[in-house]
Regions:
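An intracellular "coupling" helix at the cytosolic face of ABC transporter transmembrane type-1 domains
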Residues: 41-44, 139-140, 158-165, 169, ...
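Membrane-integrated ABC transporters
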Residues: 1-61, 76-96, 111-115, 119, ...
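Alpha-helical segments in transporter systems
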Residues: 45-70, 93, 97, 112-116, ...
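Transmembrane helices of ABC transporter permease
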Residues: 42, 46-59, 96, 103-108, ...
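Helix-loop-helix
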Residues: 78, 185-199, 269, 273-344, ...
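Juxtamembrane helix-loop junctions of ABC transporter transmembrane domains
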Residues: 21, 28, 60-73, 100-147, ...
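ABC-type nucleotide-binding domain
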Residues: 5, 83, 366-644
Length: 644
């Protein structure tokens, strides 16, 4: 009974392994087909030319080998022993042979050059598709995948593709042609000797198939491990100051060693099997050569099969030519498997489900006439409206954007089994400043993520000017919001370009005005090139406060109806904060503003302050009301409690 259970478990594991292998093989085939579409899609004509050139090159190589028979049997041997040999016909044959050889060289030159062009073109198309699709992915994808693992797709994986397309594929095609044409030639020269070749081929394919399956498995692991190492290094480089401050160099080295050890093991195993392929095929090829020479010699001596000296010379040359393509494929096998593993990871990103958007309400420039009727305008008027198309009768109605935001019994969790916000109901009337207070993890930033629809709620509704935000197109929704995040991100470019990122068509004067409003104008003018100062590396040349000021200016130039300030002044020193606060007060006039701040002094003038605790609203009111209440906010403000 125990033996039966063990046997059944063993059979079950075997079946599971076979199913995984079958699925892996199917994925590899599908990946190869998709790569082929990239190569033949936009480069179809070039690929056909490459195909023809490879055929010519392969045929020329075979012709040179086949010519040995005719040179020996028809030209050289008949001349032996002649007192006055005539070499004219031999010279003609050699001239023809030289032309064929030259044609093969030219064809090889053409297809190698064209494959480089095709390879770079395919990589460009793959990178374009990757980046274009990446832009459509939801924030959740980037929260779940490290920057390093994504960057690895653009660097390591695309580089393996380049090597395969420009080197491995041409050699594989060349090998395929050579094998087919050589086999036919061998069959025509001596069917008896070719039977031996078929047996050797069977053995060779059986051995290489076994080695290849093991190698492919480990090459896939190698690419995953390489992405892990790349991601870890990228994270530690970005956080090097934190590592040094907390003296975590040894801990980081220990963690890196573990990842590097995993990469070493997968790479060692992959290359162990991959590098085994060449010597194995080479030795089998040598065995075939020896057996062919022995058998061919016996047949030649006995006169069986009509084997002459010329036939033997050509056949032995074909024997070398026959195993040579297998050697070439073996040499490129590692590159092909690595590239297919990398391509599979790339296509996994491209196949990621894009951010869904079922909205149909659009944000448009508008104008209101004397009767209060709203009409759509192409030019900027300073007034915005929501455009509602009605599919039933084809009519369109407009709702003025005022900035009224309401949460109605909202429940949300980043994971369904872990709720972050529970039955949240709140409102911000047009022009109100709403502040959120609470410890880390209370749900403050989550609320702003939901307003942007970076994530969608599980229960309840969020309304914007009375419209359920799920009905508003995400691009239009986000265009109506200005955001200043706690972690400031600047792009490589001038200061002017970084501010203009908030509104790409902003004039220089609008950029300068936004900078003045954010009180960034003063420090910008003190820089050597002012607004044309070039920033790089996320603006490392600037202080944290200066970077924050630019972020605020970027939001100001967008001139949005609603502002979200996620701890916008938490990284600024007290002196700079007072300067920025004046500018922010001007910026916030007439807008609906959501503020998250640890410094409670910055939100005293808020119309409403909401205190959150573990995803629930425990207090709401203005500063004076909450101080009188003497609850959590009072304790935080007076220092009896501290925000964690």
């Amino acid at each position: 009974m125990i033996f039966t259970e063990k046997y059944m478990n063993h059979r079950s594991k075997e079946a599971e392994t076979m199913n995984k292998k079958k699925k892996l093989d199917q994925n590899t085939i599908q990946t190869a087909k998709r790569l082929l579409k990239y190569m033949t899609g936009t480069h179809k004509i070039q690929f056909i030319i490459v195909f023809i050139c490879i055929f010519i090159s392969s045929a020329a190589s075979i012709a040179v080998s086949l010519s040995l028979k005719f040179l020996l049997d028809d030209f050289i041997i008949p001349l032996i022993g002649q007192t006055d040999p005539n070499f004219a016909e031999l010279y003609k044959a050699l001239a023809v042979l030289g032309c064929i050889f030259a044609l093969g060289v030219i064809a090889t030159f053409i297809y190698t050059r064209m494959m480089v062009y095709i390879g770079q073109g395919v990589l460009k198309s793959v990178r374009d598709d990757m980046f274009e699709h990446m832009q459509t992915l939801p924030i959740r994808y980037f929260d779940q995948n490290t920057n390093g693992s994504v960057m690895s797709l653009y660097t390591n994986d695309t580089d393996t593709l380049r090597q395969m397309i420009s080197q491995a594929i041409p050699q594989a095609l060349m090998a395929l042609f050579t094998i087919v044409v050589t086999f036919i030639s061998m069959l025509l020269l001596s069917p008896l000797l070719t039977i031996l070749a078929v047996v050797i081929i069977f053995i060779m394919l059986k051995v290489t198939s076994k080695i290849g399956s093991n190698s492919g498995k480990y090459f896939i692991r190698q690419q995953v491990s390489l992405a892990d190492v790349t991601g870890f290094v990228e994270e530690r480089m970005n956080g090097q100051r934190v590592v040094k401050v907390f003296n975590h160099e040894d801990k980081s080295k220990e963690e890196f060693d573990k990842l590097n050890e995993a990469l070493f093991k997968s790479s060692a195993n992959a290359n162990k099997y991959g590098n085994m392929m060449g010597p194995v095929i080479g030795n089998i090829g040598n065995l075939q050569f020896v057996l062919t020479a022995v058998l061919g010699g016996l047949l030649s001596v006995t006169g069986v099969g009509g084997i002459t000296l010329g036939v033997m010379a050509s056949y032995l040359q074909f024997t070398k030519s026959f195993t040579q393509p297998f050697m070439q494929v073996a040499q490129q096998f590692n590159a092909i498997v690595m590239a297919l593993a990398g391509a599979e990871r790339i296509f996994r990103l491209i196949d990621e489900k894009p951010e869904e958007d079922e909205g149909y309400v659009e944000l448009v420039n508008a104008r209101k006439d004397a009767n209060g009727n709203i009409t759509e305008c192409k030019e900027r008027t300073g007034m915005w409206a929501w455009k509602h198309p009605h599919s039933a009768d084809g009519s369109v109605t407009y709702t003025e954007l005022t900035g009224d935001v309401r949460f109605e019994d909202v429940t949300f969790g980043y994971n369904p089994d872990k709720v972050i916000l529970k039955d949240i109901s709140l409102f911000a009337k047009p022009g109100q400043k709403l502040a959120f207070v609470g410890s880390t993890g209370a749900g403050k930033t989550t609320i702003t993520n939901l307003i942007n629809r970076f994530y969608d709620i599980q229960e309840g509704k969020i309304r914007y000017d009375g419209i359920n935000i799920t009905k508003i197109k995400k691009d239009d929704l986000r265009r109506s919001l200005g955001i200043v995040l706690q972690d400031t991100h600047l792009f490589t470019g001038t200061i002017k370009e970084n501010i203009r990122y908030g509104k790409l068509d902003a004039t220089d004067e609008e950029v300068y005005e936004a900078a003045r409003l954010a009180h960034a104008d003063q420090f910008i003018k003190m820089l050597p090139k002012g607004y044309d100062t070039m920033l790089s590396g996320d603006g490392e040349e600037l202080s944290q406060g200066q970077r924050q000021l630019l972020s605020i200016a970027r939001a100001a130039v967008a001139n949005p109806p609603v502002l979200i300030l996620d701890e916008a002044t938490s990284s600024i020193d007290t002196r700079t904060e007072s300067i920025v606060q004046k500018g922010m007060d001007n910026l916030m006039k007439g807008r609906t503003v959501f503020v998250i701040a640890h410094r409670l002094s910055t939100i005293r003038n808020s119309d409403a302050i909401i205190v959150l605790d573990h995803g629930k609203i425990i207090e709401r009111g203005d500063h004076e009301d909450l101080i009188k209440l003497k609850g959590t906010y009072y304790q935080l403000y007076t220092g009896k409690l501290e925000l964690s």
